[in-house]
Design a protein with these regions (language model features):
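Class II aminoacyl-tRNA synthetase-like tRNA-binding/catalytic domains
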Residues: 1-110
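Short, conserved charged micro-motifs
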Residues: 113-118
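Metal-assisted phosphate- and nucleotidyl-transfer catalytic regions
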Residues: 119-127
Length: 127
């Protein structure tokens, strides 16, 4: 069973994450309504499926590919972020390490590893 997230903590955390990225010119992308086979995050063996409109689709694990798509399509934007629900059909979930359904906040930006490291340092300080 997936552990419930306390709403006040959830709201506070999302407000902090959103305000950080919006203040840097990032745009939020809704990725969950995009039917796609680009669903796997790490291990394609953990992808669950669902039937929708007569077709079988993978339940999304990540919005990463859609964030990268938006970044390539809109190079003038500094970056993009999303909040999505990740579904992982872990065969042997480890308590305290694996949740099979959980919210995930992701971002993609222009730049190399150094720019990413600076962004992450700033994000940690903001939180």
């Amino acid at each position: 069973m997936t552990k419930l997230i306390e709403p006040k903590k959830y709201t506070k955390t999302l407000d902090l994450l959103r305000s950080f990225f919006l203040s840097r010119g990032f745009l939020e992308v809704h990725t969950q309504n995009r039917l796609s086979i680009l669903a796997a995050c790490e291990d394609p063996e953990t992808v669950a499926t669902y039937e929708y409109n007569g077709e079988v689709w993978p339940l999304p694990q990540t919005g990463q590919m859609w964030l990268e798509y938006e970044l390539l399509k809109n190079p003038e934007v500094p970056g993009f972020f999303c909040l999505s629900t990740s579904y992982r059909q872990e065969p042997n979930p480890v308590a305290g390490r694996h949740e099979v359904i959980f919210p995930m906040f992701e971002f993609e930006m222009h730049g190399g590893v150094e720019a990413l490291e600076e962004m992450e340092k700033d994000l940690v300080a903001h939180l």
